[in-house]
Amino acid sequence: MAVKRIKNHSSGKRQTVVVDYKSILTTSKPEKSLLVTLPKKAGRNNQGKITIRHHGGGHKRKYRIIDFKRNKDNIYGTIKSIEYDPNRTSFISLVVYADGEKRYIIAPKGIKVGDKIISGNENIDILLGNSLPLEFIPEDTLVHNIELSPNAGGQITRSAGASAQILGFDETKKYILVKLNSGEVRKFRKECRATIGTVSNDEHILENLGKAGKSRHLGVRPTVRGSAMNPNDHPHGGGEGRSPVGMDAPRTPWGKRHMGVKTRNNKKSSTSMIVRRRK
């Protein structure tokens, strides 16, 4: 896979670096049976109030139904296409199973059209794209799409280029220790499933949109500095000209301390599953 720098030296293209999709993706159209309409919310709730800042606009898109559970056991599937998904940073693959069923999965790095994949338990080979419980995956194996609880579907390590490393059983033999991308070491139930390999599109981090309009196409609205606002809109607002923050530490728009402050609630039940905090 490769990225390409746009050689056009106009203002909107000068810094642009994009992934070369033509060298990676197939030219097939999305599978219609796995598409659903995706209404736009623009970051608003049912009262019209902003609940998520910087959302709105963007190109119309349809949602691709992804098989995060990978629960079609002991039936081989064939990779028919590798496609772009506007709803995530990774690529997706269309899998056609031996019984004719079609499903989308998150495409692992290195998967090719025609490759065979399978899901199951202890009898499954440790090969790229196969899915099985953590207890049957050897130490040091890189995995993605990890379940937080058995049969819930993968929720961890799904973005472009992400992977987690299996460290082995804990002392109780009920949990598997997994090192996540952030450096956090976490315990997972040994029955939780994961998929072998690293998520595709690992060079997404090298992309440079080049211009504000590209962000707007993606549905991302501008981020305004707090110091450029009025004091009734942000704690940093007001003052004459480019005034300093005027307090001992930066604040969020809602007045809480910002930057370097731990925000995790230690009373969460899942805190007991974290062996080592992220860096």
Curated annotation (Swiss-Prot):
GO BP annotations, alphabetical order: cytoplasmic translation
Keywords, comma-separated and alphabetical: Ribonucleoprotein, Ribosomal protein, RNA-binding, rRNA-binding
Top-rank taxon, per record: Bacteria
Location of the region described as Disordered in the Swiss-Prot/TrEMBL record: 223-279
A single GO molecular function term of this UniProt record: structural constituent of ribosome
Compositional bias of kind Basic residues: 254-267
GO cellular component assignments: large ribosomal subunit
Subunit structure as annotated in this protein's UniProt entry: Part of the 50S ribosomal subunit. Forms a bridge to the 30S subunit in the 70S ribosome.
Function: One of the primary rRNA binding proteins. Required for association of the 30S and 50S subunits to form the 70S ribosome, for tRNA binding and peptide bond formation. It has been suggested to have peptidyltransferase activity; this is somewhat controversial. Makes several contacts with the 16S rRNA in the 70S ribosome.
Family: Belongs to the universal ribosomal protein uL2 family.
Protein's name in the database: Large ribosomal subunit protein uL2
Lineage: Bacteria, Bacillati, Mycoplasmatota, Mycoplasmoidales, Mycoplasmoidaceae
